[in-house]
Amino acid sequence: MSDSGASRLRRQLESGGFEARLYVKQLSQQSDGDRDLQEHRQRVQALAEETAQNLKRNVYQNYRQFIETAREISYLESEMYQLSHLLTEQKSSLESIPLALLPAAAAGASTGEDTAGAGPRERGAAQAGFLPGPAGVPREGPGTGEEGKQRTLTTLLEKVEGCRDLLETPGQYLVYNGDLVEYEADHMAQLQRVHGFLMNDCLLVATWLPQRRGMYRYNALYPLDRLAVVNVKDNPPMKDMFKLLMFPESRIFQAENAKIKREWLEVLEETKRALSDKRRREQEEAAALRAPPPVTSKGSNPFEDEAEEELATPEAEEEKVDLSMEWIQELPEDLDVCIAQRDFEGAVDLLDKLNHYLEDKPSPPSVKELRAKVDERVRQLTEVLVFELSPDRSLRGGPKATRRAVSQLIRLGQCTKACELFLRNRAAAVHTAIRQLRIEGATLLYIHKLCHVFFTSLLETAREFETDFAGTDSGCYSAFVVWARSAMGMFVDAFSKQVFDSKESLSTAAECVKVAKEHCQQLGEIGLDLTFIIHALLVKDIQGALLSYKEIIIEATKHRNSEEMWRRMNLMTPEALGKLKEEMRSCGVSNFEQYTGDDCWVNLSYTVVAFTKQTMGFLEEALKLYFPELHMVLLESLVEVILVAVQHVDYSLRCEQDPEKKTFIRQNASFLYDTVLPVVERRFEEGVGKPAKQLQDLRNASRLLRVNPESTTSVV
């Protein structure tokens, strides 16, 4: 597909006024045949694949947004965890108050003022100058003096190789640190032992140096504002793990136990929140320096009172919805009764009455509460109606048995669901009806039963669909056409299995296809033409049957040719001669009388007569199966069959030395060229509707005028 053609097609499909139906109609009118439509289909498919690739690329580009979403989820999870932890601590604190002595409480009042905003564990840690970390590792807090902070940083710089230049930042201090084990994210294989150092604005990950006890090497440094922490649920033996997300990578670490893991999660979230609050305060202070002039006071704005009155007016009106009527108060219970008694129409009538009453009214809390109760009943009613249309229910009632449930679903505003369930129910019914047909007797008898059952069911379904969904969205009709195409595929599967897979004769197959076409044309009564679908589904099987029968004729003709003695036929009795004349007249050979005499002799070879009957029979049966997609297959098969007989006559004429037999062969050749071929050509044109140039060329290229007496080979 060229770039210009692709861009032109893309612009056409992306235009605001694009209409698919008009586009397909114009395309069908402008195309020369099936090949053009196939090429256009390939172009549309290529454009669809290109669009899919662009969509994948856009999804990958939006991966950062996914990371941000995961980060916010982890924030929420951590906050919920901390809230639960704080509530537990507050509960234990309140329970311990009655047990404390009043003098002790008075003595502790002076020291409790500075730590009143923190939990018990944080208050004790603040008094000691540090927060306890895992396994005795100190967790420094912002309350530690400048000297302690500097001392902690100095110790850190001495233990970690390669981080001195990275951590010399004013105001930076150590908050928490501890040993961790890193795991591979995909296969959960252990990678290495690391040590984590959490600062007030970043997280440092360092690897162990096995040959140097207590020393580490710098591995990675992550700013806290770009870091998301996710708790990993325990899945033994993998437990006590948490994940760090840093676009575009993630790392999984395992703590020594559940307590240390909890400490890591808490302190990471606390530090991230503190950093966020600090930067927000800095932004607010910076914004305050360039704040706009003060807003006009309330007393100097004469319009503010009027605006407040206007805003208050709807609120007052919202409270005036009257829900005290008895039928509204009892509506939820009445809906329950209707659903229990399977009074679907009554339930929907009540809902319509309520919607009509509340149509133009506001939605104060009382109305919202009523709506919530009613919506729950609507959900229950929908579930019951869906069950009524499920294929598991009895299918004996036919399409009309579904009308009640379908109509109520449409009234509830669920037309699409009603359409889907109705068609699914009818598909199950059609499948069951086809499966219950007994295969017995002749194939044609079974096909008559199959066509009657299937097309009658399809016609009833179409009429019921038109009744139920009249006036609804046109998309439902598109869904019905798709369903009919699928149902036709189910029918063709059963049809082909019995007709073509069982190797029936071509005449039987032709009669069966004729019966199916006649039934399919009955759907035209309701404006539904599925003939092209049945053609498309049967073309492969019919083509195979034609080619198979062609090979049978060719083999039979070659076998007769091998035994050819070039003698006149002797039918022995006048009755046999009369029967042959009748057969030739039915084949379209009207001048057969000139090749017969007063006695029972026929001045033609048995091989030529048998070939004529077999070829004309093949043509008649093939024309019953004909539709445009099979034109070239039928034409090429006819030409190939005729060439076998013509070449045999030409070869025999060259090789025969007896003058009397040579004259007889010429008479048979004249019968083939002057009688049989024109009949084949005329009958083909009558059945197809247009002449066949290949047959004309075959007849016009008379072999009798090009015979080389010295040649002993046939001209192909």
From Swiss-Prot:
UniProt record, GO biological process: endosome organization; exocytosis; extracellular matrix disassembly; Golgi to plasma membrane transport; protein localization; protein transport
Region (Disordered): 110-149, 275-319
Key words of the record: Cell projection, Cytoplasm, Exocytosis, Phosphoprotein, Protein transport, Transport
GO cellular component terms attached to this protein's record: cell leading edge; exocyst; growth cone; late endosome; perinuclear region of cytoplasm
Superkingdom of the organism of origin: Eukaryota
Ranges of biased composition (kind: Basic and acidic residues): 275-284
Effect ascribed to mutating residue 233 to W: Strongly reduces interaction with RALA
Matching PANTHER family: EXOCYST COMPLEX COMPONENT 8
Function, in words: Component of the exocyst complex involved in the docking of exocytic vesicles with fusion sites on the plasma membrane.
The protein, known as: Exocyst complex component 8
Native source species: Rattus norvegicus (Rat)
Gene designation per UniProt: Exoc8
